[in-house]
Swiss-Prot record:
Textual note on the cofactor: Binds 2 metal cations per subunit in the catalytic exonuclease domain.
Species assigned in the record: Mus musculus
Name by which UniProt lists this protein: PAN2-PAN3 deadenylation complex catalytic subunit Pan2
Exonuclease domain sequence ranges: 974-1146
Cofactors named for this entry: a divalent metal cation
GO-annotated cellular components: cytoplasm; nucleus; P-body; PAN complex
WD repeats: 153-193, 195-231, 244-280, 328-367
Subcellular location: Cytoplasm, P-body; Nucleus
MF term (GO), any: 3'-5'-RNA exonuclease activity
HAMAP family: PAN2
Domain commentary: Contains a pseudo-UCH domain. This ubiquitin C-terminal hydrolase (UCH)-like or ubiquitin specific protease (USP)-like domain is predicted to be catalytically inactive because it lacks the active site catalytic triad characteristic of thiol proteases, with residues at the equivalent structural positions that are incompatible with catalysis, and it cannot bind ubiquitin. It functions as a structural scaffold for intra- and intermolecular interactions in the complex. The linker, or PAN3 interaction domain (PID), between the WD40 repeats and the pseudo-UCH domain mediates interaction with PAN3.
Amino acid sequence: MNFEGLDPGLAEFSPAMHSTLDPVLDAHLNPSLLQNVELDPEGVALEALPVQESVHIMEGVYSELHSVVAEVGVPVSVSHFDLHEEMLWVGSHGGHATSFFGPALERYSSFQVNGGDDIRQIQSLENGILFLTKNNLKYMARGGLIIFDYLLDENEDMHSVLLTDNSTLLVGGLQNHVLEIDLNTVQETQKYAVETPGVTIMRQTNRFFFCGHTSGKVSLRDLRSFKVEHEFDAFSGSLSDFDVHGNLLAACGFSSRLTGLACDRFLKVYDLRMMRAITPLQVHVDPAFLRFIPTYTSRLAIISQSGQCQFCEPTGLANPADIFHVNPVGPLLMTFDVSASKQALAFGDSEGCVHLWTDSPEPSFNPYSRETEFALPCLVDSLPPLDWSQDLLPLSLIPVPLTTDALLSDWPAANSAPAPRRAPPVDAEILRTMKKVGFIGYAPNPRTRLRNQIPYRLKESDHEFDNFSQVTESPTGREEEPLHTVSKKYRKVTIKYSKLGLEDFDFKHYNKTLFAGLEPHIPNAYCNCMIQVLYFLEPVRCLIQNHLCQKEFCLACELGFLFHMLDLSRGDPCQGSNFLRAFRTIPEASALGLILADSDEASGKGSLARLIQRWNRFILTQLHQDMQELEVPQAYRGAGGSFCSSGDSIIGQLFSCEMENCSLCRCGSETVRASSTLLFTLSYPEDKTGKNYDFAQVLKRSICLEQNTQAWCDNCEKYQPTIQTRNIRHLPDILVINCEVNSSKEADFWRLQAEVAFKIAVKKYGGEMKSKEFALADRKELRSPEGFLCSSIEELKNVWLPFSIRMKMTKNKGLDVCNWADEHELSSLGAPSQWGPARAEEELGVYVYDLMATVVHILDSRTGGSLVAHIKVGETYHQRKEGVTHQQWYLFNDFLIEPIDKYEAVQFDMNWKVPAILYYVKRNLNSRYNLNIKNPIEASVLLAEASLARKQRKTHTTFIPLMLNEMPQVGDLVGLDAEFVTLNEEEAELRSDGTKSTIKPSQMSVARITCVRGQGPNEGIPFIDDYISTQEQVVDYLTQYSGIKPGDLDAKISSKHLTTLKSTYLKLRFLIDIGVKFVGHGLQKDFRVINLMVPKDQVLDTVYLFHMPRKRMISLRFLAWYFLDLKIQGETHDSIEDARTALQLYRKYLELSKNGTEPESFHKVLKGLYEKGRKMDWKVPEPESQTSPKNAAVFSVLAL
């Protein structure tokens, strides 16, 4: 090839000048490359780009024609020549797309495709452009209008698309499958399994699909079935790029070396006729991209990321003279593409610049391009200036375009109607105490407001429209009007209920992470934030889940069940209904005032800060007691059983701090008593001079407490003034601190210390309060122990709490405490350290505690306030949920979860954000404990157990327990149905327009759970039919729908097989853990009320199996009549009948759909079902005899 006019020095190639390309620099090998590139908008100036006024292009020789900036400082992630118009498309790492028209690269359009993810591939179609990001496929017009936006699963990590025909698209990524999407219906039609995961490059010929894998392999797949026909193991490390032309396949990649992966300078070439490799081609650059450019011959273009480009024949030898250099503005080339006409090459670099190389002065991108549509030019050249300083200037001088349409000002008054002010919501106390006579309700006056006075601004309108700022309440209870606003993410979140309940509420809007939130509508759910804190303590999470005892209302067991649900959830909120149910039964909780009435919780009466601090002390004590009662070495077998006790527990090992209390009488008599505590309460100094105190000083004063009090002296035999001191013997692994900011005195102390600390920081770092940046030397001093760099001194406002503290036990039973950051700064400045060598710290009794969580009270007079938590989530949680290893602070506000800056966790504006609880953990805490979770639930929970009911007879048994040879296996079918009773009625209001608005849904409790065998000779026979004993007051038994009658749940008079909720819960948990598949009708609601999290692949719900999109759900009774010719649920519901019917419907579904292989024929059956339902108004015809099928043949297990 002729390369005349190029610099001869480019032909002199020195391997020493070109280091081995790091494999992590390649975007196909390491898709997270672009996420680690620092974006510097000021790094590239437009004036610095070399733009030549005239470019001399030699025919047949590629030379640079133009260079333009797509987005300053943002790396180019993909480039693509439009296949229909003379345009070049460029996607950036910031999710922005830009198009350039013609070889002059005139900017045509520019718009944002995705707010956070980079654009990974672009595909042009006739009517628009397809953009692929991590888990989103967006089809947009060339001007930027969205045609469709298809959201993939959050767990997907897509990298490549391939257009197989005009309406079918293949999408591949780092998963073990490739999706086929129909562009006409915008639906996923097929999911092809891939044996080797990681499909990042796809090509197509008239014979095969070619898939390039991150493992270094290239697979050839059938065009119809997508099955592997052949596979080339190209590279031992990873694949960088490959291309196919004719009967040749060329690939470049990385090979494994002793020091890791290295770029392989041998291109692998394969003959597709013989399906074998031919002589590899050695090149003189580090290949990162390659393309066939078949103009005259099948030559290859090989590109390195440093900008070197070499042309060679795939079956010949590479000549070092055939190398030219692209001059990128950034250090790396990120993309490369060739136009359809092979006349133009496009390169994108890491600084956002695009370089166009052509082989002719006037190239065309496509052989036959259609005309591009441009925007209409402005029809008005100029308008006369108007002097707005003239007050009498008539507005009619402003020219407006002529229009034939009616103007809004011409709207007739007859078609207008006044909008009256909405009626205020009825007071919750009135609704609670209201009695009804017919349709009229009456209630006593709650005396909460003056006569004939209604607030102008209604609370409900504030929730529905975010037009008014939330005004906070003073933390000290003062009556003045506060002036500070509450940030939106800290406000109390509420669930908006519709006629579909929670199904159409978008929880993803509040939580974009994969961590699970907690629902707030359950009574006493104010402790949600503390449940999250305990869950993200890794030793607590693991060790609590290993606990299982025989106590019915054990908080440790219920907390372990809740933690298990939080582990399984992938971003969906959970509810702690069973845990809070057990919590309400603890007498100590009621005695401490921890059980709130619904009206008190809704109105925010009482101090939530004091409440959560009492709850914190109670839960640690209760868990300590529950964990002391060790279970016998067998599975849970009912309500009875024996315990063996122990003096210590896992909670005690984690939280307990051994103390020594010394009482010294004035007579000289000294009494020493040992004790332990699970948490500490801050005790603030009485100093009113405004002295500066470190947090460590206040903490030490609170731990090593000294006070004068009257106490009994055995020597004096009377009460005497004594000096009581408290010394510490052993430091806990987790340091829990109650802040006790309950009055203006403590609030003023925090505010004063934060102001003093901020002034010291300003003075120390030589900046002013208005400065936003520091000098380099000062920025180094602001580096925290976790590597965080504070970019602005404004972030240190309202910060007094340190992120780390160091504690040391002295030889004279004393305790030294200091802020770790302060000591770190002193040592970095060369000052001597008082703690000794770091590697011998623990041997010397020195420990570092890192802040893990802060629980704060949000003061808001409009909503009554709320409790939120800032939690530092560790690497193990991110690895399990997000698939990444890093630490991050998050805000947990019930079901709202949002990542935050670490300084936000310690910024306490005492006007609305008051600290309540602090959690510090020892550094490297997880390495001190065995964190393996062993499922404590065994198969014996399914065996026969005694009933709690005293009057039950064996002749009335409605189920046969499983035998040992019938134990379920993975994939077995189990029919399930549950019946419920109502504990609290729904709270709703009727609006002025006649619509009903649900304020609070009814609280349901499970009353009966039935499981029937799904296969085998005893198919359809139940093996669980448990009635759940309840101690709570039942408002409505719902006998018409549940079949539950008063007395069925009372152990004294019930004749049913009565058991505890925990016993039946363990049976279902075992079935879920073993991997059975549940068949039922409306299982989503059943599992929600039972408080179980079941993987979606283990749920076969006939509600959705016999459902068409955007159509109504069909009842089990109608489905049974239509498909099975059965008439069920005649007088009441029976869970055995419903579970068996759901199993039969599932068998019918498999029969009609041919095991799911013929969806089209089954779709026709559903059409007929919906047509029949509309004709009959979805009502089953009444039988000739009013006797129900159940009365005609009563089911008896013993008769089978």
